[in-house]
């Protein structure tokens, strides 16, 4: 196991906030002295089973701690998932059935172990302890927190102010998530910055029950390839961890230069010192950002595929955008038969308006099957048509 200072450097890499950094060092010193592992927790709500790089930010951090010799515990919220995490929601979420939750959990499990070592990961379901609580114990748990404190939470506060309903069961979500920390005696819990309330609740509850408080480590939310909104499947700006090596490589190359370092920090296992060198090179204009981005794309593809596939993806990219070739196996994009070219462009580029799409065409920035589009009014889109928008965005259509 690495020395304490080196461990802290790795743990801090890319982290937005650590509560409390001093306590973290004390826990690491104690673990080293007693030759024990720290219990590192991540809770997952299995309501959205497909994992993209934004979700993987925390999983990659867990892998780093796993490699440092600590115990990783993944808690699948099969019990809490039937409520659904209300974080950031403007209304009560529809409850999932236990069958839906378990089906999603199976998909999660398959994807999690593309990142974590299955043999060194403790996978738990919180129904194992939450289902066993009797009503007396639930009342005792509820007594540890007040409604006033719950309403300090931003999403609840907004809904209360706007006279939108808040189910009492929704107040139990952060309490149950906090109880998970007690059940496994968590030393550290990871989450996104949007999970702040839930993670700090874990610290509060542990203290209420006389246990040692967990360290809460918050990872930043990752912007999608558009560089504007957080990565989201619904916004179409995501990179799925199960995408092909070629699609993954091409998508990484689409991120703005301003996000290169952030992606290195959050999406790769590159050592912080190596990232500092790249940061310095970029700041001093000693390298072409495009070359560094290609290095980033290769690093990411290697993590989810292998070096050979990453090399093939790089060749594919060079053929596509440097030698102006259009390979057959490009990403497929679904459009409806009634969509015209303008509507298709807006769908493909989620942040492009119809007027911007028309301007792109007028500027010669759109190609259909290798030819610049001049008059789009009479174009009828067909399956297997290839649309190229700008220099990097290229898709093959599937018309439904």
From Swiss-Prot:
Catalyzes the attachment of tyrosine to tRNA(Tyr) in a two-step reaction: tyrosine is first activated by ATP to form Tyr-AMP and then transferred to the acceptor end of tRNA(Tyr). Its main location: cytoplasm. It catalyses: tRNA(Tyr) + L-tyrosine + ATP = L-tyrosyl-tRNA(Tyr) + AMP + diphosphate + H(+). It comes from Clostridium acetobutylicum (strain ATCC 824 / DSM 792 / JCM 1419 / IAM 19013 / LMG 5710 / NBRC 13948 / NRRL B-527 / VKM B-1787 / 2291 / W). This is Tyrosine--tRNA ligase 2. It comes from the Bacteria. A motif ('HIGH' region) lies at residues 46-55. CDD domains: S4, TyrRS_core. GO terms for biological process: tyrosyl-tRNA aminoacylation. GO terms for cellular component: cytosol. It is an enzyme of class 6 (ligase). Keywords: Aminoacyl-tRNA synthetase, ATP-binding, Cytoplasm, Ligase, Nucleotide-binding, Protein biosynthesis, RNA-binding. One of its GO terms (molecular function) is tyrosine-tRNA ligase activity.
